[in-house]
């Protein structure tokens, strides 16, 4: 089975970008709660 490099990269970005975005939002809200 031949692996499509562009397909793998697109899938990785499709998973990593939303996940990192949610992590950043979570860290921001968590740090704000600790400050209060």
UniProtKB/Swiss-Prot annotation:
Keywords: Chloroplast, Membrane, Photosynthesis, Photosystem II, Plastid, Reaction center, Thylakoid, Transmembrane, Transmembrane helix. InterPro entries: PSII_PsbM, PSII_PsbM_sf. One of its GO terms (biological process) is photosynthesis, light reaction. It comes from the Eukaryota. Disulfide bonds: none annotated. It is a single-pass membrane protein. It is found in: Plastid, Chloroplast thylakoid membrane. GO terms for cellular component: chloroplast thylakoid membrane; photosystem II. The chain crosses the membrane at residues 5-25. HAMAP family: PSII_PsbM. One of the components of the core complex of photosystem II (PSII). PSII is a light-driven water:plastoquinone oxidoreductase that uses light energy to abstract electrons from H(2)O, generating O(2) and a proton gradient subsequently used for ATP formation. It consists of a core antenna complex that captures photons, and an electron transfer chain that converts photonic excitation into a charge separation. This subunit is found at the monomer-monomer interface. NCBIfam families: PS_II_psbM. PSII is composed of 1 copy each of membrane proteins PsbA, PsbB, PsbC, PsbD, PsbE, PsbF, PsbH, PsbI, PsbJ, PsbK, PsbL, PsbM, PsbT, PsbX, PsbY, PsbZ, Psb30/Ycf12, at least 3 peripheral proteins of the oxygen-evolving complex and a large number of cofactors. It forms dimeric complexes. Belongs to the PsbM family. This is Photosystem II reaction center protein M. It comes from Chlorella vulgaris (Green alga).
């Amino acid at each position: 089975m031949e692996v499509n490099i562009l397909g793998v990269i697109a899938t990785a970005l499709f998973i990593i970008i939303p996940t990192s975005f949610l992590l950043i939002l979570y860290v921001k809200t968590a740090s704000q709660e600790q400050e209060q």
